[in-house]
């Protein structure tokens, strides 16, 4: 971690920078007392471990008695940490000021949360191990659109933009997504976003997150969105989510399929596992057809957990075709789930 104390350009501030070479995180702490300007680099894990164990509200003092030592004092505690010259810390010098745009933190968090569970864990297909961010246009309206898929399920969500933006499509890595989500959960306001060919920058007031991007081409996800699913299944969300979760409890492997036996206005869900037993639940639904189809229970729970309204709509075609899932309370998000065999 790199620490810079300044009383000039950024008055009375401590700037902390950390990196793992894939991510760079910069945080400015204001209203600190700078007696003398300075900068150094030390171990982030050791410093974090010390600071988190100091009583809340206690004053902490830093000093640099020599180029190789950083002294940390608080009440009756004194620590001397090994450090190296700040000039050896790897910093990025790219110009991110081009093509900058802003989006509200809650909108950005929505896009991430509604897509991140569909990210692939298959390292051999690195282009699927993140979220694809790009600008789309519907009629004369511009959107920032996010998409993620592991080839068994897919999430797509979009947010309306005030104006068309200059933004090259990017694939944001999984590690970056989860780090960004943790920052957004504690922040409310506009997030400035800018990118160059291989990196992207997010600015949240006093915090900056810079990330490498995934080098690859995201597949044409539009062509796999079902367009002929005319059999509409309408269910109350909470009872559906609870029922799937309960029935799936029978299975030792959560990847076991939950079988849907659909008749007019009735859904029978069942799980049968030779090692642990079986379970069945019935729900009253709106449905005018007959159809048997099976799904991975985890996929259904992941989608249902992200819906905003009180209903879930599942559009079906036949036993072997993917299902299209919509949230009546959010027309800007869709989900596609492949069925399981048997």
Regions found by a protein language model. Name each.
Residues 1-5, 9-10:
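Single conserved hydrophobic/aromatic residue that forms the stacking wall/gate
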Residues 7, 15, 59-61, 130-134, ...:
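Short, surface-exposed charged micro-motifs
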Residues 10-25:
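N-terminal glycine-rich anion-binding loops that anchor highly charged ligand groups
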Residues 14-16, 47, 108, 112, ...:
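Short, structured motif recognition centered on aromatic/hydrophobic residues
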Residues 23-60, 94, 119-129, 153-194, ...:
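A cross-kingdom feature marking solvent-exposed beta-strand/loop segments within repeated
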Residues 63, 67-168:
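Intrinsically disordered, low-complexity linker/loop segments enriched in Gly/Pro
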Residues 90-109, 207, 212-236:
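Surface-exposed beta-loop interaction hotspot
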Residues 210-213, 217, 323-342:
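A short, hydrophobic, proline-anchored segment that marks a local hinge/packing element in signaling
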């Amino acid at each position: 971690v790199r620490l810079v104390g300044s009383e000039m350009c950024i008055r009375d501030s401590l700037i902390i920078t950390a990196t793992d070479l894939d991510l760079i995180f910069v945080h400015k702490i204001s209203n600190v007392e700078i007696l003398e300007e300075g900068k150094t680099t030390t171990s982030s894990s050791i410093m974090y471990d010390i600071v988190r164990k100091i009583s809340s509200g206690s004053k902490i003092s830093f000093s640099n008695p020599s180029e190789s030592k950083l002294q940390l004092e608080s009440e009756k505690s004194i620590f001397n940490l090994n450090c190296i010259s700040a000039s050896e810390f790897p910093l990025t010098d790219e110009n991110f000021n081009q093509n900058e745009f802003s989006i509200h933190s809650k909108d950005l968090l929505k896009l991430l949360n509604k897509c991140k569970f569909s990210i692939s864990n298959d390292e051999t297909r690195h282009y699927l191990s993140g979220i694809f961010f790009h600008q789309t246009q519907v009629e004369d309206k511009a959107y920032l659109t996010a998409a993620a898929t592991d080839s068994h399920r897919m999430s797509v969500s979009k947010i309306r933009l005030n104006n068309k933006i200059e933004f090259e499509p990017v694939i944001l890595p999984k590690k970056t997504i989860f780090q960004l989500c943790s920052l957004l959960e504690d922040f409310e306001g506009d997030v400035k976003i800018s990118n160059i060919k291989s990196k992207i920058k997010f600015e949240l007031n006093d915090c900056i997150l810079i990330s490498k991007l995934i080098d690859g081409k995201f597949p044409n996800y539009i062509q796999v969105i079902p367009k002929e699913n005319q059999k509409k299944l309408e269910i109350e969300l909470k009872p559906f989510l609870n029922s799937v979760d309960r029935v799936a409890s029978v299975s030792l492997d959560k990847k076991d399929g939950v079988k849907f036996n659909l008749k007019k206005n009735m859904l029978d869900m069942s799980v049968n596992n030779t090692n642990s037993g079986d379970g069945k639940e019935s729900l009253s639904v709106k449905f005018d057809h007959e159809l048997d189809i099976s799904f991975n229970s985890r996929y259904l729970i992941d989608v249902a957990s992200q819906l905003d309204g009180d209903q879930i709509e599942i559009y079906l075609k036949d036993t072997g075709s993917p299902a299209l899932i919509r949230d009546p309370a959010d027309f800007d998000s869709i989900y596609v789930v492949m069925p399981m065999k048997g």
